[in-house]
């Protein structure tokens, strides 16, 4: 069928007619991968199924071109007539083609980046979607912004970006698939290399087909929900694959960039430029599956992994350092070690006999290797049986012990004139030790403030001094402070404990038992008052935590954000607390709940103001404040292009120290592959440096006044629909797959805080996820149109002020650009399909009204931004979205009709005979359908639905 063949390529070329630039290979990459995939589909399932998939694709592509909704109906009736086995294969095919399109994009982006670096052409760096290159940033600071080189070097040395990995319910892709995707990317990259021979090409092509087929034949659906340990292992796999080697490579690039602006020094290995933390196994907020045992396991697991990673590199280092010249200080140490160790260690692969004394560096490193071996084994024993026969003295217990012999080698090499050798693998190794430590990542603990209140309440009740929960804030503070200043223990083993109390105290006991370098911060969610922070300080002391964790209040809801500065000021006015914190405090601000509460515009503005106020308070008390940004991956939950988001923060709020959460669903796009990892580290570093040295402007008073007014109108409009419209919840539940979302086995956390209840009790994640699935994105734009309309009706000249804000004020610019990106991905026509099929007759008009509101908001946005068309400023993104859309449309239609069949068993469909050659024997049950044993729906429906959810999530990218 050659003419069909052309058709899918031709459709791809029609969708993105002009090349965006001469190095643009995206359409080529995409067509190659899709062609390979369709050939595989035909081999496995026969020509009829392949033809069916192509027809669906064509209908979708035609709809994308002419927006004729009749085509969607035609597509729907085609899809509903499929038998269960076929419908799973078709949904899975589209989901895979989308994944392949994403891989083609990643390769194209990395490729374009390399070409730009070669040419040194950064003309479009100023536009939103491109990211800042570290060398360009350094050069710009020195040449254009008049900073001295030393200032820049100093700022870099003292800057810290702490990336906090969180497990995430919508990391929709299984690890088994992530690895296959990595290999597909590599094949694609090599296939287009300049110096490739015909044989190479043939072998790569075979490898590519093999990997695509392996991915397609893997069950994409998790059949059991992941445990927190699974989530943690998934997160840690990125360290193995890319981050471990990526960090020293990146730091080396910074050395090069510094050299190129005339600094002839390397970045010291103990400069804390990048750090990694994690919430996986530490975040208990609303997740009953994270117990004290889980936390202990996760810490030991990370320590074991770290020791193993160092261990795997130490022999290479021993090979490299074969010199015999060394300093006296090192010679003495080597002789001591040589005399004391006499046995041969046969379980090592290299250097298993005793190292001769004329290789002093190897003697020293041999001892380090022994200690690493024992460190790893001890963690392994503790993890599997809780006890270990290896004494603690034989292992590394803190990072200083580990650094000391390595620093000794470094000093000695430099003293003997071998500095170039010292700056090789040894420097990389030192940097790894400094960045990752013995624990690989620092684990944060997060718990709700009410749980601490309950524990203290049971203590005060037990002591017979009243009920802590009923006391006023003043009384709580007085009691907590008198206890903190006193010395006596609060409770003994006779304290009556409920399951909840035992869980909270158990966590503190784990903090006391494990080495202090395992942990980062103790975060209190729903924190409102100083007593919330003091309570954690007291519990840490009572449970004998030797080096108490820093306590970080988290402010999320709109009202909490408004009250945050006052609460922090009250905290700083307590002398005991000021003595405890040593001039440093961290505050976390959460994006997702504030957005669900009041809509995106008001939440973003409230965040901005809260940060400004918090910084003022901290300055007044002489405290260095670190902001911890809890951003989601989606725009509705604070996501968006990294460097832009950083540069749009208020001036003075970052000051060279930034903590940001990297959500599960974004980890893959940020660290999934070497080049991506490099780019992510570069983006965060460059943007943080630039924000500190060249802060964005403060908004003019009239801009502030306008924003305040707009936020009030936007919140009112948002709440009038989401919270006050009596039938909104009913509409939301029927127009989106929210009810079915919980079946996806995506994360270890329940999707509701409380089983019954309306929008309030829904977690922010499913709320956003559901609207992204139908491509209506309601929480992101709702309220925005009303606000702009109100401002323009009040005074027609305000449009000029808004345009000025858009052009001059990064915060406003970013807020609008993200909105524009969401409009580019949205499609009310698709949302209408869901409405027609799933929403009750008398609610249809409500949906129509919302869609009208959507179109109006979009027009107003374009007017303010001065664009004729969505995304006209970003041709690259526009092209990528066009290529993805046709796949997503088919999945949307398939999802809407599948939901209809699940919810309305009487819905009439006319079944066809099976298309796939795998399922032609009708007497046999289809194996593919039997993978799902538990489904309560008709065969095949649940899996088809889950596949469409995953596919759409992959297509929208910043979804989850």
From Swiss-Prot:
GO cellular component: cytoplasm
Residues with PTM Phosphoserine: 7
Record: active site: 168, 596
Gene3D superfamilies: Phosphoenolpyruvate/pyruvate domain
Reactions catalysed: oxaloacetate + phosphate = phosphoenolpyruvate + hydrogencarbonate
Principal localisation: cytoplasm
Keyword Signal applies: no
EC number: 4.1.1.31
Activity regulation remarks: By light-reversible phosphorylation.
Keyword set includes Transmembrane: no
A single GO BP: tricarboxylic acid cycle
A Pfam family per the record: PEPcase
NCBIfam families: PRK00009.1
PANTHER family: PHOSPHOENOLPYRUVATE CARBOXYLASE, PHOSPHOENOLPYRUVATE CARBOXYLASE 2
Protein's UniProt name: Phosphoenolpyruvate carboxylase 1
């Amino acid at each position: 069928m050659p003419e069909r063949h052309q058709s899918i390529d031709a459709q791809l070329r029609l969708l993105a007619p002009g090349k965006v630039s001469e190095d643009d290979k995206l359409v080529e990459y995409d067509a190659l991968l899709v062609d390979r995939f369709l050939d595989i589909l035909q081999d496995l399932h026969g020509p009829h199924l392949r033809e069916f998939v192509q027809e669906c694709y064509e209908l979708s592509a035609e709809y994308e071109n002419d927006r004729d909704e009749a085509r969607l109906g035609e597509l729907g009736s085609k899809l509903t007539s499929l038998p269960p086995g076929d419908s799973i294969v078709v949904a899975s095919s589209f989901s895979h083609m989308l994944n392949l399109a994403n891989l083609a994009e990643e390769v194209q982006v990395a490729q374009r980046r390399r070409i730009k670096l070669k040419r040194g052409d950064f003309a479009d760096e100023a536009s939103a979607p491109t990211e800042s290159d570290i060398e360009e940033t350094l050069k710009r600071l020195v040449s254009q912004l008049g900073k001295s080189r030393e200032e820049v070097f100093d700022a870099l040395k003292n800057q810290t970006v702490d990336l906090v990995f969180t497990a995430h319910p919508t990391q929709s892709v299984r690890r088994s698939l992530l690895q296959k995707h990595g290999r597909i990317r590599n094949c694609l990259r090599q296939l287009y290399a300049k110096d490739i021979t015909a044989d190479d090409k043939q072998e790569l092509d075979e490898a590519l087909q093999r990997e695509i087929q392996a991915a397609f034949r893997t069950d994409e659906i998790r059949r059991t929900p992941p445990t927190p340990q699974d989530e943690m292992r998934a997160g840690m796999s990125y360290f193995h694959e890319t981050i471990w080697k990526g960090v020293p490579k990146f730091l080396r690039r910074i050395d090069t960039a510094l050299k190129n602006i005339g600094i002839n020094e390397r970045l010291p290995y103990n400069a804390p430029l990048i750090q990694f933390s994690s919430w996986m196994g530490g975040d208990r907020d609303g997740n009953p599956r994270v117990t004290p045992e889980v936390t202990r396991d996760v810490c030991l697991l990370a320590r074991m992994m770290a020791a193993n990673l160092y261990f795997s590199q130490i022999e290479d280092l021993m090979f490299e350092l074969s010199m015999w010249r060394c300093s006296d200080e090192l010679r003495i140490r080597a002789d001591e070690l040589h005399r004391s160790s006499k046995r041969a260690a046969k379980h090592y692969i290299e250097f298993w006999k005793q190292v001769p004394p004329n290789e002093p560096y190897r003697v020293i490193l041999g001892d380090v290797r022994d200690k690493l071996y024992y460190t790893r084994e001890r963690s392994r024993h503790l993890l599997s049986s809780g006890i270990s026969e290896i004494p603690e003295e034989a292992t590394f217990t803190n990072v200083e012990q580990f650094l000391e012999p390595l620093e000794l080698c470094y000093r000695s090499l430099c003293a003997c004139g071998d500095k170039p050798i010292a700056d090789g693998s040894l420097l990389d190794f030192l940097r790894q030790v400094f960045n990752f430590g013995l624990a690989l990542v620092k684990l944060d603990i997060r718990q709700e403030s009410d749980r601490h209140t309950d524990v203290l309440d049971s203590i005060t009740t037990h002591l017979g001094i009243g009920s802590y929960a009923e006391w006023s804030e003043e009384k709580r503070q007085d009691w907590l402070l008198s206890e903190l200043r006193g010395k006596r223990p609060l409770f003994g083993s006779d304290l009556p404990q409920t399951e909840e109390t035992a869980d909270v105290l158990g966590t503190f006991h784990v903090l006391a038992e494990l080495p202090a370098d395992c942990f980062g911060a103790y975060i209190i969610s729903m924190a409102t008052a100083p007593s919330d922070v003091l309570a954690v300080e007291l519990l840490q002391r009572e449970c004998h935590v030797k080096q108490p964790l820093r306590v970080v209040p988290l402010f999320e809801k709109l009202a909490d954000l408004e009250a945050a500065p006052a609460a922090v000021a009250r905290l700083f006015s307590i002398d005991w607390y000021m003595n405890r914190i040593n001039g440093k405090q961290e505050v976390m601000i959460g994006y997702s709940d504030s957005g669900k509460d009041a809509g995106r515009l008001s939440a973003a503005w409230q965040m901005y103001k809260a940060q400004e106020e918090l910084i003022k308070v901290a300055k007044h008390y002489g405290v260095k404040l670190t902001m911890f940004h809890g951003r989601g991956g989606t725009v509705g939950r604070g996501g968006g292009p990294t460097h832009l988001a950083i540069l749009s923060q208020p001036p003075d709020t970052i000051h060279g120290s930034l903590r940001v959460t990297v959500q599960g669903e974004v980890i893959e796009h940020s660290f999934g592959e070497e080049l991506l990892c490099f780019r992510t580290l570069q983006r965060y570093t460059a943007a943080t440096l630039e924000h500190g040295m060249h802060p964005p402007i403060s908004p003019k008073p009239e801009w502030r006044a306008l924003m305040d007014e707009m936020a009030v109108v936007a919140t009112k409009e948002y709440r009038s629909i989401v919270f006050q419209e009596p039938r909104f919840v009913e509409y939301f539940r029927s127009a989106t797959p929210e009810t079915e979302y919980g079946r996806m086995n995506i994360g270890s956390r329940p999707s509701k805080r409380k089983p019954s209840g309306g929008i309030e009790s829904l977690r922010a994640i499913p709320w956003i996820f559901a609207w992204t699935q139908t491509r209506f994105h309601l929480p992101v734009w709702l309220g925005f149109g009303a606000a702009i309309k109100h401002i323009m009706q009040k005074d027609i000249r305000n449009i000029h002020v808004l345009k000025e804000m858009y052009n001059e004020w990064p915060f406003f610019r970013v807020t609008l650009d993200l909105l524009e990106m969401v409009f580019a991905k949205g499609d009310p026509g698709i949302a209408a399909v869901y409405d027609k099929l799933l929403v009750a007759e008398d609610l249809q008009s409500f949906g129509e009204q919302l869609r009208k509101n959507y179109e109006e908001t979009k027009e107003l946005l374009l007017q303010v931004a001065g664009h004729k068309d969505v995304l006209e400023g970003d041709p690259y993104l526009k092209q990528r979205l066009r290529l993805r859309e046709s796949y997503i449309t088919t999945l949307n239609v398939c999802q809407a009709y599948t939901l209809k069949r699940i919810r309305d068993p009487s819905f009439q469909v006319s079944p066809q005979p099976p298309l796939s050659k795998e399922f032609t024997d009708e007497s046999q049950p289809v194996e593919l359908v039997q993978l799902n044993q538990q489904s309560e729906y008709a065969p095949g429906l649940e899996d088809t639905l889950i596949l469409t959810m995953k596919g759409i999530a992959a297509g929208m990218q910043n979804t989850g």
